[in-house]
């Protein structure tokens, strides 16, 4: 199949985003709905018939294409974006002028976590920077934060480059002894955390310095790790919430509109939870399709991994109810151990096929400072 794939046309990705933007600007729900079929067609063509030319790039790009498709389902089809408002917005969205709607749509499209909107889940996000903080104070602080994430990412990447379990022809992550499995699981998490945090912090510095956005629009992308004493709090409060809007709105649609289940019931809560984790699994599984292609059914583990997370949360919830558990200091310490052990057990089975396919080729930066200091070679390491 790979010999018949065409180069991924960047123009189609732009066209998909243009359709989403037009839909967000438009006052007409009918017009928005008419935009979804071309978004679906363009997305399916890219996913099924094209490639970036590098499987370790395809896995990321295919997940992004799927995310845009689901965002299209949210904006164009299952919800009315006119119901959304910015914080402090008094004029109904459909009554804004064309120029105001264009700016409003730009804010919506660039805010996957709904930062600055009334539907932002502020109770689960880190605090916003203070609105009265001077711009250059924010820029200096975020610049130091960005440097910190760069150092962490560079060190983690050097360790990954030197570790056989992350290489295409390396040792299986599931076959190493448990102490090393603990270490490699922590390294993988540290890479994702530092990589996304670095990019996010760097973007905040640039965009605030240019006056494109305000400093209080940049709450940290990851939450406080002290909340990771349950699987539920890890996914809901610690890990990034970039997909929160699209997984929750589709969960709402399936649970409360399609199945019409009453809110607050055991069945409705779990249908919503499993739907949300299923959607997250789909995003990552389609990414795996871009990497594995004909071997996707044998190697993909995303759906299994994310549905296991929903199951773990269900078990936590019911055990907590039965034994009336409260987050005492002792139970929190035990909870941190439980959370880490859970990921040591479940994560390697999902990630190992990806590492054998070259997933770590994309990790870090082309030139590594720590690798150069360690090996005396200032060279490309990815």
UniProtKB/Swiss-Prot annotation:
Q: Which family does it belong to?
A: Belongs to the wax synthase family.
Protein task: Acetyltransferase; part of the gene cluster that mediates the biosynthesis of erinacines, cyathane-xylosides that show unique biological activities, including leishmanicidal activity, stimulating activity for nerve growth-factor synthesis, and agonistic activity toward the kappa opioid receptor. Within the pathway, eriL converts cyathatriol into 11-O-acetyl-cyathatriol. EriL is also able to acetylate cyathin A3 to produce 11-O-acetylcyathin A3.
Q: How does it sit in the membrane?
A: Multi-pass membrane protein
Q: Which GO terms describe its biological process?
A: lipid metabolic process
Q: Name one Pfam family in it.
A: MBOAT_2
Q: What is its EC number?
A: 2.3.1.-
What Gene Ontology molecular-function terms does this entry list?
O-acyltransferase activity
Q: Main localisation, per the record?
A: membrane
Q: Which InterPro entries match?
A: Wax_synthase, Wax_synthase_dom
Give the residue spans that cross the bilayer: 5-25, 33-53, 59-79, 146-166, 192-212, 335-355
Species this protein is from: Hericium erinaceus (Lion's mane mushroom)
The protein's name: Acetyltransferase eriL
């Amino acid at each position: 199949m790979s010999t018949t794939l065409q180069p991924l046309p960047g123009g189609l990705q732009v066209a998909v985003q243009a359709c989403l933007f037009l839909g967000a600007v438009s006052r007409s729900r009918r017009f928005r709905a008419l935009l979804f079929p071309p978004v679906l067609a363009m997305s399916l063509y890219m996913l099924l018939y094209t490639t970036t030319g590098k499987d370790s790039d395809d896995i990321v790009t295919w997940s992004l294409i799927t995310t845009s498709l689901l965002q299209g389902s949210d904006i164009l089809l299952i919800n009315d974006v006119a119901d959304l408002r910015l914080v402090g917005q008094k004029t109904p969205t459909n009554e804004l002028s064309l120029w105001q709607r264009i700016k409003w749509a730009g804010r919506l499209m660039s805010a996957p976590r709904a930062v600055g909107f009334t539907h932002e889940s502020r109770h689960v996000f880190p605090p916003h920077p203070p609105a009265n903080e001077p711009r250059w104070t924010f820029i200096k602080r975020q610049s130091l934060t960005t440097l910190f994430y760069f150092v962490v990412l560079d060190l983690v990447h050097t360790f990954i480059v030197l570790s056989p379990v992350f290489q295409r022809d390396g040792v299986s992550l599931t076959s190493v002894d448990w102490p090393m499995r603990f270490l490699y699981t922590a390294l993988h998490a540290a890479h994702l955390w530092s990589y996304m945090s670095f990019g996010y912090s760097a973007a905040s510095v640039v965009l605030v310095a240019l006056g494109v956005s305000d400093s209080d629009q940049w709450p940290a992308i990851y939450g406080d790790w002290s909340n990771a004493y349950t699987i539920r709090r890890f996914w809901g409060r610690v890990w990034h919430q970039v997909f929160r809007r699209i997984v929750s709105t589709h969960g709402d649609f399936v649970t409360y509109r399609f199945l019409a289940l009453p809110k607050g019931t055991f069945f409705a809560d779990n249908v919503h939870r499993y739907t949300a984790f299923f959607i997250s699994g789909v995003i990552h599984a389609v990414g795996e399709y871009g990497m594995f292609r004909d071997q996707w059914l044998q190697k993909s583990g995303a759906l299994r991994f994310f549905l296991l997370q929903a199951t773990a949360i269900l078990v936590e919830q019911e055990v907590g109810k039965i034994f009336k558990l409260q987050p005492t200091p002792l139970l929190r310490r035990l909870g941190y151990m439980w959370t880490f052990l859970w990921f040591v057990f479940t994560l390697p089975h999902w990630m190992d096929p990806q590492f054998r396919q070259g997933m770590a080729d994309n990790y870090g930066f082309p030139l590594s400072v720590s690798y150069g200091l360690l090996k005396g070679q200032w060279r490309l390491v990815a």
